[in-house]
């Protein structure tokens, strides 16, 4: 817990303190009082009866002693249960393909009052300009949008080509809570001075981790360097060991990486202060149809029998404490009045949301969205410096009898397996093998890096995207070079987006005009477009639930086992480039 940084975020003047204390004593009229409400006690379990008294942004008092207290306005909760606003401990808003403004409109009415965001997707494409835009959005947002300074731009030096560099000078910005996920864990473990310098610069804040599957002495060394949390755990014993060694565990349930079922059995009354919830990457279709952090809480309660107060604890208070946001996470005197009223606490049915002491109206958020987005001055402009391609760019030569490496996909997981397949005159000995290529898009004029992909389920057609973690070069998979070229040229021509090609034609396309990552459409419109895109993709075969999100991680070298970057095939276990042909 980072009490040392709490002063950075808890801004309240002496005059505000005096007014708050006067309302607490009952000497001054409150701004709001929420009546007919039960407060879920996240510390002891059970419930607290009585009103919630609000002055300005803060809670002045709770409990039956305020039953007759005066207020300028009273809110009848109609028997609802009050819980603290939900907090997402780690996410990339860009992965929702929504702008921060649109993301707030879509998620704040669902009770998501605070996010800890790492904008390293747009930073990898645009550098300082991308981070500055996120900071502007955070400043004007009703939602508490905190930022982590991106630590790895690119994810690993020398493994890929990205669009920009980035400095760490943002650490003193008022919305910055720490250093974002340190993905180069081999570099940290080996004691590379450049990485240790980054960690030293942020030791007064939080140091986020990223170490999927790490164990043994290597995990001990990574934690000894000061890394405080990890959101990449995907196995029960892996998560348990990280908790034992003092690491905080972020339990992730995104659109591609779904680890909640594996890790939820770890959560109990004792370790819940060390457990948090995060989404990492979640698309607007799932947000609209299933929810955000509210969906994760619901599953903890309904599917894993986590007690109510523990489920809501890991969704709020645990995360607030971890990041030193001590003014958040509890419904208690002096805390910021971020309140979610639930008509059904077990089903996480949100009745009303207050943030910073003010009720939220979803229709008002929607009506103001366009003007607020314009006010944030988004960084428009074409970020794709790549000439059109032809089918010959994807031509690979194979020798009968030779064995070739295949990136083997695991549906709904970010990790892959490294497999191999033998080529004959009739093709490969596996009928699920298709082609994959990554094309650098930042003007370096590299030839496409090509490889083989298995287990994805693509039987025909091609998919292309400018969303490919973390450098966001162009990634394409396909059954034919001609359709791969058609899909790639569509996203080049339009300045970025997601494309489905089948039967020699573009079947569906989603434009992403901001950095090739984000749309400026509303959340509802974007969800509808994604629905159409996924429907078109399903015509190509039995693909993963979220084919474009799964495809986007096939180029991220810091997650094992075999990936493809713009510079070639990368062994994520040996942390070294390898060859397509198996020669050893």
Curated annotation (Swiss-Prot):
Cofactor: Mn(2+)
Catalytic activity: adenine + H2O + H(+) = hypoxanthine + NH4(+)
Keywords: Hydrolase, Manganese
Enzyme Commission number: 3.5.4.2
Entry's Gene Ontology BP terms: adenine catabolic process
Leading EC class: hydrolase
GO MF annotations, alphabetized: adenine deaminase activity
InterPro entries: Adenine_deam, Adenine_deam_C, Amidohydro-rel, Metal-dep_hydrolase_composite, Metal_Hydrolase
Annotated Pfam families: Adenine_deam_C (PF13382), Amidohydro_1 (PF01979)
Source superkingdom: Bacteria
HAMAP family registered for this protein in UniProt: Adenine_deamin (MF_01518)
Family: Belongs to the metallo-dependent hydrolases superfamily. Adenine deaminase family.
Subunit record text: Homodimer.
Name this polypeptide is given: Adenine deaminase
Native species: Shigella dysenteriae serotype 1 (strain Sd197)
Gene: ade
């Amino acid at each position: 817990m980072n009490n040392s940084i709490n002063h950075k975020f808890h801004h309240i003047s002496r005059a505000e303190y005096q007014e708050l204390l006067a309302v607490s004593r009952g000497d001054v009229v409150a701004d709001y009082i929420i009546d007919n409400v039960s407060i879920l006690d996240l510390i002891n379990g059970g419930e607290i009866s009585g009103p919630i008294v609000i002055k300005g942004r803060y809670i002045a008092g709770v409990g039956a002693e305020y039953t007759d207290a005066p207020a300028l306005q009273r809110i009848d909760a109609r028997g609802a249960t009050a819980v603290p606003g939900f907090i997402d401990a780690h996410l990339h808003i860009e992965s929702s393909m929504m702008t921060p403004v649109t993301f707030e409109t879509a998620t704040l009415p669902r009770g998501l009052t605070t996010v800890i965001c790492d904008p390293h997707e747009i930073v990898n494409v645009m550098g300082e300009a991308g981070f500055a835009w996120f900071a502007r959005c955070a400043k004007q947002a009703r939602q508490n949008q905190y930022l982590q300074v991106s630590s790895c731009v690119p994810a690993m030096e020398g493994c890929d080509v990205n669009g920009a560099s980035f400095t760490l000078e943002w650490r003193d910005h008022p919305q910055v809570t720490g250093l974002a996920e340190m993905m180069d864990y081999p570099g940290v473990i080996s004691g590379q001075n450049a990485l240790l310098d980054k960690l030293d610069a942020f030791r007064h804040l939080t140091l986020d981790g990223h170490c999927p599957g790490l164990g043994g002495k290597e995990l001990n060394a990574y934690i000894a360097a000061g890394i405080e949390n990890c959101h990449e755990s995907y196995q029960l014993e892996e998560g348990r060991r990280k908790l034992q060694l003092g690491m905080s565990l972020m339990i992730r349930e995104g659109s591609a990486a779904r680890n909640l079922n594996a890790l939820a059995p770890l959560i109990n009354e004792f370790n819940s202060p060390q457990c948090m919830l995060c989404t990492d990457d979640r698309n607007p279709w799932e947000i609209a149809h299933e929810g955000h952090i509210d969906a994760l809480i619901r599953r903890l309660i309904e599917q894993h029998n986590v007690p109510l107060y523990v489920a809501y604890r890991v969704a709020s208070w645990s995360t607030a404490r971890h990041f030193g946001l001590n003014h958040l996470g509890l419904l208690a005197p002096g805390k910021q009045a971020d309140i979610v009223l639930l008509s059904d606490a077990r089903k996480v049915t949100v009745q009303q949301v207050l943030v910073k002491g003010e009720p939220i109206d979803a229709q008002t958020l929607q009506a103001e969205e366009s003007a607020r987005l314009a006010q944030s001055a988004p960084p428009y402009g074409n970020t794709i410096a790549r000439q059109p391609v032809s089918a010959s760019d994807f031509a690979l030569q194979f020798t009968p009898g030779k064995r070739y490496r295949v990136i083997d996909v695991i549906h709904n997981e970010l990790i892959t397996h490294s497999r191999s397949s033998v080529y004959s005159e009739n093709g490969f000995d596996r009928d699920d093998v298709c082609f994959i290529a990554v094309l650098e898009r930042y003007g370096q004029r590299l030839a496409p890096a090509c490889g083989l992909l298995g287990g994805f389920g693509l039987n025909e057609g091609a998919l292309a995207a400018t969303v490919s973690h973390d450098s966001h070069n162009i990634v394409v998979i396909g059954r034919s070079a001609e359709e791969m070229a058609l899909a790639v040229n569509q996203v080049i021509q339009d300045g970025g987006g997601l494309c489905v090609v089948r039967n020699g034609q573009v079947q569906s396309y989603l434009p992403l005009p901001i950095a090739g990552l984000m749309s400026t459409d509303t959340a509802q419109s974007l969800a509808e477009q994604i629905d159409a895109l996924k429907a078109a993709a399903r015509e190509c075969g039995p693909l993963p639930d979220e084919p474009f999100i799964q495809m986007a991680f096939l180029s991220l070298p810091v997650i094992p086992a075999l990936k493809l970057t713009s510079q070639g095939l990368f062994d994520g276990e040996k942390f070294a480039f390898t060859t397509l042909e198996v020669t050893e």
